[in-house]
Amino acid sequence: MEIKIIQNYILYLIKDCGLSVSLHPFQDETLITGSTLMNFNIHDNSYCSYIKSLPNGHKECVSQQKKVFNQCCQTNENFCDICYAGVKEYIYLLHNKESIIGFVSVSGYACDNKEKYISFISEQFDCNLDSVSREYNKLKANMPDKKRIDTLILPLCKMLELAYLKEIKDPQAASLNEAICHYIQRHYSIDLTTDLICEKFSCSKSYFSHSFKSYTGKSFR
């Protein structure tokens, strides 16, 4: 399934349905990490952005996310949880047969005992209590009904799982696309052209154009 279709559906969930959706792949999963879907690898609410802006805030969030990965592997089912900073979220697992390849998060909701978390964050990062409280209160107060979220998010999970299966059926193409994406990222300051990339990776222009768009969801240049 085209990356662009998945991307458009996520944008629909965010803009039209008012959901804060983010994608969190495991390290060896390249469908998301090697495409424009990585743009959705972050919680977009102002409270989470505020915490990540604090000294060691981003590092702590990454560390805590590993615990979510572990919980995914232990439970092997979708669940609702509260992160260390007090943000309530739905977690939907992404599977490849018996293996878990990542998860989808629907986040950005305040919990009932917010004062405990606000105080904890203020002490943890040695920051102003009022500032933390002000940012926390920007979170959404009411969490949507799980049946509604299931109806919207489960199709996204299926799209991602099918796209992942399509990718691993052609590992050579996936590996080449991943290598090309990494090369472009490493040499972003150079005026890269289609000719240069095709020469570097010994592929035709037509193959590169079609494969790159299918893999990333956008045309090169």
Give the ranges of each region predicted by the language model.
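Structured interaction and signal-relay segments at domain junctions
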Residues: 7-87
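Basic/polar phosphate-binding segments, predominantly the helix-turn-helix DNA-binding elements
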Residues: 191, 195-221
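N-terminal positioning helix adjacent to the helix-turn-helix/winged-helix DNA-binding module
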Residues: 172-180, 216, 220
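Short helix-capping/hinge SLiMs at alpha-helix to coil transitions
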Residues: 186-190
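Sensory/regulatory domains in signal-transduction proteins
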Residues: 69-120, 152
